[in-house]
Structures are given as structure tokens and as C-alpha cells.
Amino acid sequence: MKIRFTKMQGCGNDYVYVNGFTEHIPQEKKPEFVRFASDRHFGVGGDGVIFINPSDEADFEMEMYNADGTRAEMCGNGIRCVAKYAHDKGLTDRARFSIISGGKVKYMELTVENGVTKAIRVD
């Protein structure tokens, strides 16, 4: 299985980010993929994997997994990286948008300079 990903960190929390709009892993295979990708000796390495998905309840869904393959609800640094990824990779051109994670909607406000996200406020 070939999956394109991006490795990002926010204040020391490092995750593997997967664009769920273009990359598809069956739900039942995700825990195994997460464990492999998160392994710092044999995989990419990270605190876990975050899938950036479409959502009916917000502009994006942050589907977050811990390194052991279990689901997680929220990481403040992780959601900031999702916001930066979504804007910088062209998933949105708006500086204000919403992300749902763990059943809760959070609102992002980005500071963008020359097309690059420089700061993110989460409400």
C-alpha cells in the first residue's frame, strides 16, 4: 500500500498527516497503518497519525490516532497543524474555518503572510 503523507510537528507533538480527500485506507486497516507509520525505528515515527477528512459537520474532520493505533479525540498542537496543512496545501483559501475532532467543532483563525500560514488561533 502506497500512501502519501506529510510529517509535521507543533511545539514538539509530531504526527504523520494523511490527506483523507485523496488517500484512502479502509477503516479496519487504519490501526495497523498507524502503528507502522508511528514506529520511530521502522516507520516514519511520530506521536500518531492524523487523517484530514471531509466532514458534514464542519469544513474538515481531524481523525486522530495515537501511535499504538487507538483513536484519540483532540490535540491542540495537532489541530493547528491540520489548519496549516489545509490552508497551505490548498484545501481551503479561507483564513477562518472549522474542524471537528472527537465530536467537537473548533474554529480556526489563521494569520497568513505571502500565502504562508504564520499563526493559528483555535476557539
Mark where each language-model region is:
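A glycine-rich beta-to-alpha transition motif near the start of alpha/beta enzyme domains, typified by
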Residues: 1-116
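Short, solvent-exposed secondary-structure boundary/capping segments
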Residues: 116-123
